[in-house]
């Protein structure tokens, strides 16, 4: 009798409404949303070891003007002068899902691969983006979200303008924020909170704080050494958000036929790990190569 195939413990499971549920033994730890009503794909929730999400949608005290804060998302404020960061305005673009490429399930990781079009306000495509979202299981119910990105200019050179806004951002749960929950921001350079970390380069930035009355959890945003501006300048705020800036120091041009590839990680963890532990996790991540996107249609 043939041996039954093993059921992967980590699975990326398609859901109604253009969503993918990342599950460990059938229990969701994250969900990728790629419907076009939001103007950009995003990941929400990111479930920590306690069973609660360490991220949220929107600013807890200013939800109207920060409605574009979608938990974990990819965006940029200046793409050939078009604003892909905010949702409202005269020159606002949209990141529109085009297609899904293969799913991947295994014992300790699951992934989904998609194609997005970055369209200006007239619908003109500026960039084609290929994205791979991976959830990698770690000991003690912790896990790592890996975001691989490949940007290609569609027909003419595209300039990502100088700005601290973009491309990788995380909005933390209200109780984890420094202002609202008494949380703490730390970086790889030994600095703490907005005053010391804001607009400073680092390998990683961690945001930890209360998630229940008895538990502390958080997330660490990793910049990969293969990224062209590593170590990235981080834009952080005590109100609960952190982002890795790609073009803080100057613009970057993507020429046709010469795609830009990026890799980031978000480590979802229990407690407030020591800096040495976070550095060890970052070093493990730094040794992993960026995902190799195969030519489309092959």
PLM regions and their residue ranges:
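Beta-strand-rich N-terminal accessory domains
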Residues: 3-67, 279
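Residue-level recognition of well-ordered beta-strand positions that form the cores
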Residues: 27, 115-117, 130-132, 148-152, ...
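Extracellular/lumen-exposed scaffold segments
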Residues: 37-87, 182-204
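Extended, loop-rich substrate-binding clefts of extracytoplasmic carbohydrate-active enzymes
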Residues: 66-141
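Active-site/ligand-binding surface loops and adjacent short beta/alpha elements
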Residues: 157-228
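Beta-strand-rich recognition/accessory modules
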Residues: 219-298
